[in-house]
């Protein structure tokens, strides 16, 4: 490990610890109430079900779990996203390690992930994106394990995690779209998922097993959540607006870190089209493009493509630090 790298890791973890400490202190000393969506999720948690009007049920379940053990308080609610992002950072570490087999880089990636503007800001807010990012990351990890070690149990666990992702937010459908993209791009993925059809059936079976209660609930209430999601998308009001598209792209660079993104752009020509690159781009670019199109046609909030940040950020950090002789701390 180089002297610069040691200094970077030390500095990063000092700032990481200070950031966590500041967030915990802010939670304890603030007198703010829960904002609209947080309050709504808390109300749902008082009456558990397999679905709700505008969201799948996981957010209510997890609030109920934490408040049962820690009590119904502002502090408890605000602790949840912080805890989940810390665990997500560890999953990102495992993902980077699985992809590049470099512990130093994996540590840097995980620490940088937690300090990424999107994560730093949203760790103060209890949103469904917090849980989707966590289970999306776990799904990516077991997708990798399923390809490198195609045991039946890995496909079963993959289906479970993707299913839970759907229970956090229906945007998890992007995972299935991205899977199809990677199957098209990568021969080994095609072999594992298509030519060995038992693996695909196990994956689909465990996915549906997790989703079944929510599907039944939606059927019983006239698919109200899907109707709400469709209305929220507003594609029936489509009108091309390129400015909104540029606005969305700008918001994504802010969420990633403008400085790291600019460095990445300068290093982009050195990217090799390896399996790692195909994997990470397959689970990021399709999501960005879909939401970008929606932003041009109707509108799109910056967080609608949040899951794409996981794969793209890992690739970006790999390229920045691999191509730079000197470690750059942002």
Positions of predicted regions on the chain:
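Short helix- or helix-capping micro-motifs
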Residues: 16, 106-117, 162, 166
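Hydrophobic/aromatic-rich transmembrane helices and adjacent perimembrane loops
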Residues: 48, 255, 283, 297-324
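Loop-to-helix entry region of an early transmembrane alpha helix in multi-pass inner-membrane enzymes
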Residues: 57-61, 71-90, 122-125
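Transmembrane-helix motifs of polytopic, lipid-linked glycan transferases
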Residues: 79-100, 138-142
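Transmembrane-helix signature of polytopic, membrane-embedded enzymes
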Residues: 92-115, 133-134
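Membrane-interface transmembrane helices that cradle and orient dolichyl/undecaprenyl
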Residues: 98-100, 139-155, 272, 320
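Short acidic/glycine- and proline-prone juxtamembrane loop motifs at membrane-interface regions
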Residues: 118-131
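Transmembrane-lumen/periplasm boundary regions of multi-pass, lipid-linked membrane glycan transferases
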Residues: 164, 175-277, 283, 287-295
């Amino acid at each position: 490990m180089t002297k610069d790298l040691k200094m970077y890791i030390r500095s990063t973890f000092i700032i990481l610890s200070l950031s966590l400490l500041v967030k915990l202190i802010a939670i304890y000393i603030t007198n703010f109430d829960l904002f609209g969506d947080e309050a709504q999720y808390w109300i749902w948690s008082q009456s558990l079900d397999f679905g709700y009007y505008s969201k799948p049920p996981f957010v209510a379940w997890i609030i109920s779990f934490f408040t049962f053990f820690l009590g119904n308080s502002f502090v408890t609610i605000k602790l949840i996203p912080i805890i989940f992002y810390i665990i997500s950072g560890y999953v990102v570490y495992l993902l980077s390690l699985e992809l590049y087999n470099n512990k130093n880089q994996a540590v840097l990636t995980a620490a940088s992930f937690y300090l990424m503007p999107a994560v730093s800001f949203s760790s103060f807010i209890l949103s469904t994106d917090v849980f989707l990012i966590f289970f999306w990351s776990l799904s990516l990890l077991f997708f990798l394990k399923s390809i490198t070690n195609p045991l039946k149990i890995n496909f079963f666990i993959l289906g479970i995690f993707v299913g839970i992702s759907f229970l956090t937010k229906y945007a998890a459908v992007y995972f299935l779209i991205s899977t199809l993209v990677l199957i098209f791009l990568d021969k080994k993925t095609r072999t594992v998922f298509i030519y060995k059809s038992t693996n695909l059936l196990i994956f689909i079976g465990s996915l549906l097993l997790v989703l079944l209660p929510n599907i039944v609930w939606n059927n019983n209430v006239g698919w109200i959540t899907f109707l709400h999601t469709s209305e929220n998308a507003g594609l029936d009001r489509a009108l091309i607006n390129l400015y909104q598209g540029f606005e969305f792209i700008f918001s994504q660079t802010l969420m990633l870190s403008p400085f790291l993104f600019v460095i990445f752009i300068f290093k982009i020509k050195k990217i090799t089209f390896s399996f790692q690159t195909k994997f990470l781009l397959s689970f990021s670019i399709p999501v960005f493009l879909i939401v970008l199109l929606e932003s041009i046609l109707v509108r799109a909030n910056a967080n609608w493509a949040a899951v794409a940040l996981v794969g793209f950020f890992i690739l970006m950090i790999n390229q920045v630090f691999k191509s730079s002789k000197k470690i750059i701390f942002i």
